[in-house]
């Protein structure tokens, strides 16, 4: 869930993140979004 393009669609982000819960997200520069992530089997949203 790191280095995603900023402004990525929520659906694609859910697919990309799979079972990761991402917090403290911020954009670095104009291209990448950095997140702190942790694994969770309950992250099915």
From Swiss-Prot:
Q: State what this protein does.
A: Inhibits potassium channels.
User: Know the name of this protein?
Assistant: Putative potassium channel blocker
Q: Which domain of life is it from?
A: Eukaryota
Q: In which tissues is it expressed?
A: Expressed by the venom gland.
Provide the protein's localization: Secreted
Keywords from the UniProt entry: Ion channel impairing toxin, Neurotoxin, Potassium channel impairing toxin, Secreted, Toxin
Q: Which GO terms describe its molecular function?
A: potassium channel regulator activity; toxin activity
Please tell me whether the keyword Secreted is annotated for this protein.
yes
């Amino acid at each position: 869930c790191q280095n995603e393009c900023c402004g990525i669609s929520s659906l694609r982000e859910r697919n990309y993140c799979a079972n990761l819960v991402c917090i403290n997200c911020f954009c670095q520069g104009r291209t990448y979004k950095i997140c702190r992530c942790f694994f969770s089997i309950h992250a099915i949203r």
